[in-house]
Amino acid sequence: MEGGGAPPADTVMSDAAPAPPQMGIENIPAVLSHGGRFIQYNIFGNIFEVTAKYKPPIMPIGKGAYGIVCSAHNSETNEHVAVKKIANAFDNKIDAKRTLREIKLLRHMDHENVVAIRDIVPPPQREVFNDVYIAYELMDTDLHQIIRSNQALSEEHCQYFLYQILRGLKYIHSANVLHRDLKPSNLLLNANCDLKICDFGLARVTSETDFMTEYVVTRWYRAPELLLNSSDYTAAIDVWSVGCIFMELMDRKPLFPGRDHVHQLRLLMELIGTPSEDDLGFLNENAKRYIRQLPPYRRQSFQEKFPHVHPEAIDLVEKMLTFDPRKRITVEDALAHPYLTSLHDISDEPVCMTPFSFDFEQHALTEEQMKELIYREALAFNPEYQQ
């Protein structure tokens, strides 16, 4: 980022990169396959099969419910990437749709604060296509790891992270997309303090109002309208999440660590107070009735509760953590808030030129159709692997 988006001088993080796993990279067996066009690595008993341009060494850097992530070197572009293996990607239709959605969204976007897809590995045999491998640009760590570490964070660090989240969100929202699952672990960082938003598997089009049954966003960062099952949610849901994330950065602990839906709502009302009748206007009658029967809570003073936080930061967070989404600050207005004056530069906060289309989701796709769509995305990166 040029001009207003330059990082503060002291923002390089000394130990941003987490310690690599203990398994020695030289111990990972590698075998060429399919006539030397592919290479198989055996990682913790997992077969990791990618195109032969991903030469050794390869290193496991993460593991999740979906599979395993390795850092690898693309010998053709001379770039280090993070390759995520999604094992048996088509076994569950909802998961397969998430994968397809993430691929299509990230290929549509091009922004410094949104993680980029560098490659989708084509299957060695089109007719046996079960695992999906996606290569992303490689980052050192994520905000969740930084918050939990003893890495010192200055006010300037936190301010710069907040600015970059909002800068990325401005672009995402301008593409007609809501992220819907912003949380510290979905914000990637490098040692230079560059921040990139990732994990668009739950993203939705902003004009869509049907409530999604597959909605599993992390409870702690969830806006009140989602906790109260409002189907008519807007870009304001992401702004609420940003407010929660920023306060977690400043306080080094989650702002609203609810155990369940009911506890989550209680925690946020204990801080921001019971909403007025006027602020309930966006809710359905059931939700209004539920709120009215709760014990009343008086709003706490943010400044007294968080005396170590800059007053201008408190003012911005209070505008983000506003119960009524119609009154919540927008991303554009948050970027222009006095707290971010030193970083804000409207000429360097681009928008997406073409809105993203979720048209592919309008049809009930079969497993085979989803395979074909992801296969085509892989061929866009690797046309020479057309079968």
UniProtKB/Swiss-Prot annotation:
The active site is at residue 181. A motif (TXY) lies at residues 213-215. PROSITE patterns: MAPK, PROTEIN_KINASE_ATP, PROTEIN_KINASE_DOM, PROTEIN_KINASE_ST. Residues 55-340 form the Protein kinase domain. Activated by tyrosine and threonine phosphorylation. It catalyses: L-seryl-[protein] + ATP = O-phospho-L-seryl-[protein] + ADP + H(+); L-threonyl-[protein] + ATP = O-phospho-L-threonyl-[protein] + ADP + H(+). The modification Phosphothreonine is found at residue 213. It comes from the Eukaryota. It is an enzyme of class 2 (transferase). Coiled coil: none annotated. The keyword Transferase applies. InterPro entries: Kinase-like_dom_sf (IPR011009), MAP_kinase (IPR050117), MAP_kinase_CS (IPR003527), Prot_kinase_dom (IPR000719), Protein_kinase_ATP_BS (IPR017441), Ser/Thr_kinase_AS (IPR008271). This is Mitogen-activated protein kinase homolog MMK1. It comes from Medicago sativa. The gene is MMK1.
